[in-house]
Amino acid sequence: MRFYWFKEIPSTQTFLVDLLKQEATLPILVVARNQTGGIGSRGNKWQSPKLGLYLSLALHESSLPRDLPLQSSALYFGWLFLERLRAQYPNLWLKWPNDYYKGDKKVGGLLTQSMRKAVILGLGLNIFDDRLACLCDQYDLQRLASLLSVVIDFLSFDGIEFSRILDLDSYTQDLVATSRDSVFTFPSWQCVFHKYQQEFHKNRGFSTHVMEGTSRGYIRLEDCLLREDGALVLGDEVFYSRR
């Protein structure tokens, strides 16, 4: 696994996409302390907080469960990360298909895209900001280090190189490293889906943006049914996450 750590970068996602255009070997993880031009859903610019977690990960499709509908990758990975994040933030929940909420406030999100048999996912979390909804009420680098540790442990990557950056006050230089590949086995889509299905009711009162069909625009999630492949059903129309 190739690992890139940056003190500051325009976007972990665009950096990773550029690497894949050069036919880089998978898997690849890119993490940044600061991000100046992050990408949000539907190509919107991500408004970066004073302290946040920014990472992008590229995996080969062959490493994913066979029953995973790739169009629901954001929902799948969003839930996997949510389970780990709840160890520290139990009130977090996943709004369909890819937004992290704390109560009724959005504090982060996850987007996915496919490229050359790779699935690329980008994760952004607001840890602290006095203007934006966030996870913490004060600037705390140890919270960021703790969240990084959760992600690293979750992916089962070799922690030797990662441990060098967790003292975020003193470690300021960029880092490129190679470690052993992950030994993590991803759970089946059905396993993840049934867990999320039990919490889908939390979407009541919220809406989501869809980009196809006669209902193009915002639709109320409480008016929708959740299909087995992660899609929404509204009347006779079906909507996938497309994130």
What is the meaning of each model-derived region?
Residues 21, 62-92, 102-243:
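Long, positively charged amphipathic alpha-helical accessory segments at protein N-termini or as interdomain linkers
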Residues 28, 90-96:
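A short coil-to-beta-strand element that immediately follows conserved catalytic motifs
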